[in-house]
C-alpha cells in the first residue's frame, strides 16, 4: 500500500500539489491522467524520491519512503530512459535480480518476459544502443522481476508498438490478479 499524506510541491511560486493525500492498495492498477505539465511525473517522483518533496509524508507498505527498506517494496520505471546505458540487457537484468535478492526465481520470469516482449535477440547489446521501445521493455522487465508489491510506471506505453502494448497490458493484469 502506498500512502501519501499532505503532499506539497512547488516549483518557485507555482504550486503543483497542495496538501494532497491518497492511499493506493497493493496489486491494483491506478492511472494518473491529465494534460501535459500538470504534475503526473512529479507526483510519481515524489513517491519514490521523498527528498523532492517540499512537505508531506509517503509510506510504502507502512515504511516511510525515506527509509532504505522501503525500496524493497516498490519498483519504479521513470519516464526518462537513461539509466545503466553501458550495461547489456542481460547484465542489467542480472543486476536487478541481485539487487532484490531474487536470483532463483528470476530465470524463468526473465525468459517468459523476454520472449513475450520479443527482446531475446537484444540481451547482449548495450542498453545505449536500444531504441526507446526496447529500453522501455528492458526497464519494465526489471521492475516486474523485482517481486515488489508496488510497481510504479511513468508513461509505461511510451515507445511501444501496439503488439507490445497489448502484451504489457496482459502482463500487468496478470500481476494484479496474482495479488
Where are these regions (language model features)?
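Q-loop/switch helix immediately C-terminal to the Walker
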Residues: 80, 86-101
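Conserved ABC ATPase "signature" region
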Residues: 94, 98, 105-122
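Conserved structural motif at the start of ABC-family nucleotide-binding domains
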Residues: 2, 17-19, 71
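Catalytic Walker B motif of ABC-type/P-loop ATPase nucleotide-binding domains
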Residues: 151-155
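Conserved ABC transporter NBD signature motif
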Residues: 56-72
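Helix-to-loop junction immediately C-terminal to a conserved catalytic motif
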Residues: 48
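The feature captures the beta-strand-to-loop junction immediately N-terminal to the Walker
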Residues: 33-35
Amino acid at each position: 500500500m502506498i500512502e501519501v499524506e499532505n503532499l506539497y510541491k512547488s516549483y518557485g511560486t507555482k504550486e503543483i500539489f497542495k496538501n494532497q493525500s491518497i492511499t493506493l492498495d497493493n496489486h491494483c492498477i491506478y492511472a494518473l491522467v491529465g494534460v501535459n505539465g500538470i504534475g503526473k511525473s512529479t507526483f510519481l517522483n515524489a513517491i519514490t524520491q521523498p527528498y523532492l518533496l517540499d512537505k508531506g509524508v509517503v509510506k510504502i507498505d507502512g515504511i516511510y519512503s525515506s527509509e532504505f527498506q522501503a525500496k524493497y517494496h516498490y519498483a519504479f520505471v521513470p519516464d526518462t530512459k537513461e539509466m545503466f546505458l553501458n550495461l547489456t540487457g542481460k547484465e542489467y537484468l542480472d543486476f536487478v535480480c541481485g539487487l532484490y535478492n531474487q536470483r532463483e526465481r528470476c530465470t524463468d520470469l526473465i525468459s517468459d518476459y523476454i520472449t513475450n516482449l520479443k527482446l531475446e535477440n537484444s540481451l547482449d547489446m548495450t542498453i545505449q544502443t536500444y531504441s526507446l521501445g526496447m529500453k522501455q521493455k528492458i526497464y519494465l522487465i526489471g521492475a516486474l522481476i523485482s517481486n515488489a508489491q508496488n510497481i510504479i510506471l511513468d508513461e509505461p506505453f511510451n515507445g511501444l508498438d501496439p503488439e507490445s502494448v497489448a502484451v504489457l497490458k496482459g502482463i500487468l493484469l496478470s500481476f494484479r490478479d496474482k495479488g
